[in-house]
Amino acid sequence: MFEEEIKIYETVLAEYRQKISQRMNGDELKEYNEILFSAHSCGIEGNSFSVDDTRELKEKGLGLIPQGKTLYEAFEILGHFKAYEFLLGKKEEPLTEELLKETHRILMEHTLPYKCPGAVPGEYTDTDMCAGDTIFGEHETLIARVPQLLDSTQQAISEGRVHPMVLAARFHGFFEYLHPFRDGNGRIGRLFSNFILHKAGHPIV
């Protein structure tokens, strides 16, 4: 299953390593990936920061917010920087609820209380969730399945029998279905699917 997709991925991966990763030192590549990934992941959720805006924020912090951008958007990007650095620094650690919740806490610390008063960064939702036209199931039932998803994914990582890209995509799909947090599920799902790739020595996508 997915043999053709894996072949295409491996071809693109080889080209990426030849044209991009081998032409940068470790620190340059890390910052390049962090800026691109943070800009695009937050952009999917409606953040208007461009890649250049995100790079400027990374270099200058809150001392200079690009014209036309909000402080809330800046805190979203800064939170993503922190969560990205925290999670990818845990490469040797297994997938656990503790790691999941702490990453969410770091990501949403300065934005969730403003967007969803009463919601606690790092804690699961206490209400049923919806996103756009999608209505998710009963939240307690879905949240109860999170440990199983983490355990089965960690087991697959340890056994090494599933291609990392397939495993990352599978995790992302199931995690978004469970939608366990009040906000930030998309960003957390993308962070952890890339964490799976990172653990296998693959680049951030």
Task: Show which residues each predicted segment covers.
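FIC/Doc superfamily catalytic core
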Residues: 1-205
